[in-house]
């Protein structure tokens, strides 16, 4: 009997003696390797689309030619970007190597999506100041950290209380891009507001504990090693969500961090009110003149191309100033 390809229900329920479904096996393999929740959702989505594209044939009966056909269809018919096509390829290679134990190797003769060479949008200091002036409270603090510390949005939202060192004016980013740790500067201008914010978060955490909650999702297997760490103050998110919910990967009800879409919407509104015509998002706040002079490993660029691109921005900004 072939494996079922859908994953509408979770395995392990009452009377469930059937083998794990394919997409559940994919999820297990991803979680075993401690990939992010976003990666899990993306990979499962691409694998499901690949199966549907080939009329629900089991991937074990398919191979490199079928992968090539799917990727070419994405580029020619769906006109996806190069990064999207690469993500789909990564998902399928993961499926064959780590789930089906059928390494594919090199996939040849794929029509590649074109990678446009674009410089990132760069704001002047004055423009950043105007955008920040239209942010308030928690969103202003997040905007300041994106701008002054050079954090990516997910890195900022995943900060734990223990990651902020007020004595050294330093922020530790744990398992950032490329699963690397790094340290960056805590802007002096945000310290007072951040301290007040954390005092409010601590009161919220105390109230959660009194109500029988107060647990937070922990990375890797830390929860099994240290069962009480989930309720400790240092492990709480700096920017917690407004409500308690159940995380499918974590289990018990907990207060997750603020959702990225909330920050994206707040910055979009601030940009609109500022009258700035550029296409600005949270990542744009990371690109500012003073931060570009720092070494690439401090900024978190995993390759030299990121630093070279920022040098091009400096030249562009100098000519347009």
Regions found by a protein language model. Give the residues of each.
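Conserved catalytic core of the tyrosine transesterase superfamily
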Residues: 1-321
């Amino acid at each position: 009997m072939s494996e079922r390809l859908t994953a509408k229900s979770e395995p392990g329920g009452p009377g469930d003696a059937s083998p794990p479904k394919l997409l559940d096996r994919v999820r297990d393999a991803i979680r075993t390797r401690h990939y992010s929740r976003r990666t899990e959702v993306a990979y499962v989505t691409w694998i499901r689309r690949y199966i549907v594209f080939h009329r629900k044939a089991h991937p074990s009966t398919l191979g490199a030619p079928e992968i090539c056909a799917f990727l070419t269809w994405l580029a020619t018919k769906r006109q996806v970007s190069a990064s999207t096509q690469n993500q789909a390829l990564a998902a399928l290679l993961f499926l064959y190597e780590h789930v089906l134990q059928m390494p594919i190797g090199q996939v040849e003769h794929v029509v590649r999506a074109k990678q446009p060479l674009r410089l990132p949008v760069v704001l002047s200091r004055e423009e950043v100041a105007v955008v920040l002036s239209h942010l308030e409270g928690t969103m202003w603090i997040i905007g300041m950290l994106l701008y002054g510390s050079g954090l990516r949005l997910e890195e900022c939202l995943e900060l734990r209380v223990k990651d902020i060192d007020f004595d050294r004016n330093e922020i530790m980013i744990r398992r950032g891009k490329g699963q690397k740790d790094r340290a960056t500067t805590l802007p002096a201008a945000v310290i007072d507001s951040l301290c007040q914010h954390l005092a409010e978060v601590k009161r919220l955490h105390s109230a959660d504990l009194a109500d029988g909650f107060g647990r937070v999702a922990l990375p890797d297997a830390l929860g099994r090693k240290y069962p009480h760490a989930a309720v400790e103050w240092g492990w709480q998110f700096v920017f917690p969500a407004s409500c308690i919910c159940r995380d499918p990967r974590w289990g018990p009800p907990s207060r997750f961090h603020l959702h990225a879409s909330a920050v994206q919407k707040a910055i979009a509104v601030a940009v609109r009110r500022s009258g700035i015509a550029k296409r600005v998002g949270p990542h744009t706040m990371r690109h500012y003149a003073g931060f570009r002079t720092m070494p690439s490993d401090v900024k978190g660029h995993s390759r030299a191309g990121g630093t070279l691109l920022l040098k091009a921005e400096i030249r562009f900004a100098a000519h347009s100033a």
